[in-house]
């Protein structure tokens, strides 16, 4: 009944999920295509009841926000082959105070970084590694799984492969990721290769290495990743009472996440769980903005750029692999692409921290785009907004400390909270508090 296969995004070519393939014969990206007619054998209300019951279940698959929607992910994967670290079901933070400050109807922040390895990449990696685990058990010769990474993908790959007992290899741009991101794959036992290049250089090499099918590619050009990441849409819909907000803002680098967000929303529309489309807004750092540039030229073509250094290091990407899917997402969802400066992303992240968040710089990019678009009235006062927060702020402690210590190059912090050093006397403390309270 439920069935999925790889399908070209630009043609009719299909391939079984058991085949190791990342593009069609003409070089176009693939997607996982489902038999959606089988989904309609249940009514929307029946799906709501089923998914609601799984939310309170302690069955291993149901403890995962991804696998609790398994009929829409990899429906034919045996339960015993699933490799899960209880990913998903991340909190939806009500940022109403910030919504009032910028005069919009409502604002929530989806905290995808509240996950096992601290980023949304867990959602896609559970699907990819589970399928690899299944293929190996079926006798496919796979020696290792490999990825190029700006930090978060490598952390997710290494953890899930460690859980499954599958060797992993990560290619990192030397000196360009945080200590927290670097230590994760090291700790989980990955083969860690630091290359004297940027992410795009690492991506080029890993594609050549994985041309040998015995080393499996784990980057988001592998459409299995998108199947896990699309469940962000399902979770949002369920958490908001089976509706989606008017606007969803998501940071964009390699653009797999926006592709996934659109695909998940397509699914919800196809099932009949929602009727109204949200607008999807992609936010890029000014220093790594090829998608923004293409958008401003009405998507005539993608012109790769040499990404400059940005505090939002995970999206420091100049040649995004998932560009074709992301372009279609923006067109289908009445979307906007915005860019923000280093100053804007830094201040936006720390402005949000003042209401109880602890934002990574990439979330700062999304928030900065929201603030800019609200000022332009591209987002109206009557609209509800959700920000997709892609990683946990604890992975970027240097960014947080540097902002408050005012040591970030080129940044003049608007919301810095300096430590006050005082003599160890009650009088000195009381005098200082009189000035501060």
Predicted regions and their residues:
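PLP-dependent amino-acid enzyme catalytic core
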Residues: 1-437
């Amino acid at each position: 009944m439920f069935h999925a296969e790889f399908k070209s995004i630009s043609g009719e070519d299909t391939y079984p999920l058991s085949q190791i393939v990342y593009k069609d014969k003409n070089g176009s990206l693939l997607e996982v295509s489902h038999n959606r007619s089988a989904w309609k054998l249940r009514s929307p209300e029946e799906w709501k009841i089923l998914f609601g019951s799984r939310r309170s279940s302690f069955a291993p698959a149901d403890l995962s926000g991804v696998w609790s929607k398994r009929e829409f992910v990899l429906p034919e994967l045996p339960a015993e082959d699933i490799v899960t670290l209880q990913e998903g079901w991340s909190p939806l933070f009500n940022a109403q105070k910030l919504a009032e400050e910028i005069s919009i109807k409502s604002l929530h922040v989806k905290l995808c970084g509240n996950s096992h390895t601290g980023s949304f990449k867990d959602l896609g990696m559970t699907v990819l590694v589970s399928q690899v685990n299944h293929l190996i058990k079926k006798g496919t010769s796979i020696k290792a799984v490999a990825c190029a990474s700006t930090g978060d993908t490598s952390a997710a790959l290494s953890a899930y492969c460690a859980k499954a007992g599958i060797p992993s290899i990560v290619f990192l741009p030397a000196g360009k990721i945080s200590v927290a991101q670097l230590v994760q794959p090291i700790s989980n036992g990955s083969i860690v290769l630091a290359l004297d290049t940027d992410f795009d250089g690492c991506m080029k090499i890993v594609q050549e290495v994985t041309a040998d099918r015995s080393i499996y590619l784990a980057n988001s050009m592998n459409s299995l990743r998108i199947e896990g990441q699309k469940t962000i849409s399902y979770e949002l819909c369920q958490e908001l009472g089976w509706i989606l907000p008017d606007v969803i803002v998501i940071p964009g680098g390699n653009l797999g996440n926006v592709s996934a967000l659109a695909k998940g929303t397509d699914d919800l529309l196809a099932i009949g769980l929602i009727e109204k489309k949200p607008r999807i807004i992609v936010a890029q750092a000014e220093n790594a903005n090829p998608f923004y540039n293409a958008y401003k030229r009405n998507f005539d073509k993608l012109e790769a750029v040499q990404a400059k250094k940005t505090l939002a290091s995970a999206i420091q990407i100049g040649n995004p692999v998932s560009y074709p899917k992301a372009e279609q997402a923006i067109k289908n969802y009445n979307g906007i692409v915005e860019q923000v400066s280093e100053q804007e992303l830094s201040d936006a992240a720390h402005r949000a921290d003042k209401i109880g968040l602890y934002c990574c710089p990439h979330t700062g990019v999304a928030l900065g785009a929201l603030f800019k678009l609200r000022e332009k009235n591209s987002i109206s006062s009557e609209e509800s907004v959700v920000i997709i927060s892609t990683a946990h702020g604890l992975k970027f402690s240097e960014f947080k400390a540097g902002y408050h210590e005012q040591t970030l190059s080129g940044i003049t912090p608007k919301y810095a909270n300096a430590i006050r050093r005082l003599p160890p006397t009650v009088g000195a403390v009381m005098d200082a508090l009189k000035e501060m309270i």
